[in-house]
Regions:
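Short acidic-hydrophobic surface loop/beta-edge motif
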Residues: 1-4
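CN hydrolase (nitrilase-like) catalytic-core segments centered on the catalytic cysteine
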Residues: 18-105
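Active-site-proximal beta-strand elements of phosphoester/diester hydrolases
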Residues: 7-16, 35
Length: 110
């Protein structure tokens, strides 16, 4: 747990939120938000159409907004290339997002 700008953050790495009990453990910390850097190699279309909804549902178990960020590989033909994307998940919803398959910056106000 750390604070920045008066906001208390917890951090989850990649598959942490899929580990049984980990989302609830993070919720018990009482953070204002969870930072969730990942490496997801789903094809961009698959992420944008369906998978992000599963991640939003899983993130809701943390009990606070979850800030998801996935790196953007410039060579999409590379094996296991990450397609980028970022989102703010809260309450099982996608509050805002930068779609996978595009480079960009997502600004989120907490």
């Amino acid at each position: 747990l750390f604070s920045y700008g008066g906001i208390r953050f917890a951090t989850a790495l990649c598959g942490d939120l899929w580990t049984p009990g980990k989302p609830e453990e993070l919720a018990a910390l009482g953070a204002d938000a969870v930072l969730w850097p990942v490496w997801c190699d789903y094809p961009a279309a698959e992420w944008n159409e369906q998978v992000k909804l599963e991640y939003a549902a899983q993130a809701s178990r943390c009990g606070c907004p979850v800030l998801y960020v996935n790196p953007f590989c410039v060579d999409p033909a590379a094996p296991d290339a990450a397609a980028g994307g970022a989102a703010c998940f809260s309450g099982g919803r996608i509050v805002c997002e930068a779609p996978a398959g595009e480079s960009g910056i997502l600004f989120v106000e907490l």
